[in-house]
Amino acid sequence: NLFQFEKLIKKMTGKSGMLWYSAYGCYCGWGGQGRPKDATDRCCFVHDCCYGKVTGCNPKMDIYTYSVDNGNIVCGGTNPCKKQICECDRAAAICFRDNLKTYDSKTYWKYPKKNCKEESEPC
């Protein structure tokens, strides 16, 4: 669920998901359109696509099982749908970590959605 996603982001990046990723670029936060603006925004685009492939459960609400082993997120549990949600969140948190150096709050934090009008690329 979104609370767990926040925890995974904090674990991987040391940053608050709400404060860093809830209103960034064209895809980080609620909804998404246009083309991703940078590598961080692309993490959110891929995460949105990943959630879009989940069927049979609610990615934003359902609780999944995970652990952290030597700094690595390990998704667990027996429910394949919930495990898929965890894998989406895990991949995004790692993507955020790997792209911290190019995170550009001056340009893309609270980026106007009116600037996200390009045709979206397919997932």
From Swiss-Prot:
Annotated consequence of substituting K11E: 75% decrease in catalytic efficiency
Phenotypic consequence of E6R: 75% decrease in catalytic efficiency
Protein name according to UniProt: Basic phospholipase A2 APP-D49
Family: Belongs to the phospholipase A2 family. Group II subfamily. D49 sub-subfamily.
Any one of the GO BP annotations: phospholipid metabolic process
Coiled coil (UniProt feature): none
Keyword set includes S-adenosyl-L-methionine: no
Cystine pairs: C26-C116, C28-C44, C43-C95, C49-C123, C50-C88, C57-C81, C75-C86
Tissues/organs with expression: Expressed by the venom gland.
Subunit structure: Monomer or homodimer.
Keyword field contains Hydrolase: yes
Cofactor comment: Binds 1 Ca(2+) ion per subunit.
Stated role: PLA2 catalyzes the calcium-dependent hydrolysis of the 2-acyl groups in 3-sn-phosphoglycerides.
Organism from which the protein derives: Agkistrodon piscivorus piscivorus (Eastern cottonmouth)
A single MF term (Gene Ontology): calcium-dependent phospholipase A2 activity
Top-rank lineage group of the source organism: Eukaryota
InterPro entries for the chain: PLipase_A2, PLipase_A2_Asp_AS, PLipase_A2_dom, PLipase_A2_dom_sf, PLipase_A2_His_AS
Effect of K10E: 95% decrease in catalytic efficiency. 500-fold decrease in catalytic efficiency
Reaction(s) catalysed by this chain's protein: a 1,2-diacyl-sn-glycero-3-phosphocholine + H2O = a 1-acyl-sn-glycero-3-phosphocholine + a fatty acid + H(+)
Named cofactor requirement(s): Ca(2+)
